[in-house]
């Protein structure tokens, strides 16, 4: 099942690493493909809900680092659930 969402992801420092609101194009996600903290947030949302969640590193990307997200990062997501297909 896909969830159609707008989301803005940032580090606790405020550095934005993803923003579908700004792009004007929502994204479709399979819940099982998402980090655990994002899954937990979506499971508590209804279509049309808009929320901001703070995800600790243990429920995010963990120890892994990449170019945009250092390991052990707390993540802040602004999420708007647009639909479920």
Labelled PLM ranges:
Residues 1-13:
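A short beta-strand signature
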């Amino acid at each position: 099942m896909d969830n159609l969402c707008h989301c803005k992801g940032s580090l606790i420092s405020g550095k934005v690493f993803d923003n579908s609101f700004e792009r004007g194009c929502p994204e479709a996600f399979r819940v099982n493909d998402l980090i655990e903290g994002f899954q937990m947030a979506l499971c508590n949302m209804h279509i049309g809900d808009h929320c901001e969640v703070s995800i600790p590193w243990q429920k995010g990307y963990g120890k892994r680092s990449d170019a945009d997200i250092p390991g052990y990062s707390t993540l802040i997501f602004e999420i708007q659930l647009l639909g479920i297909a």
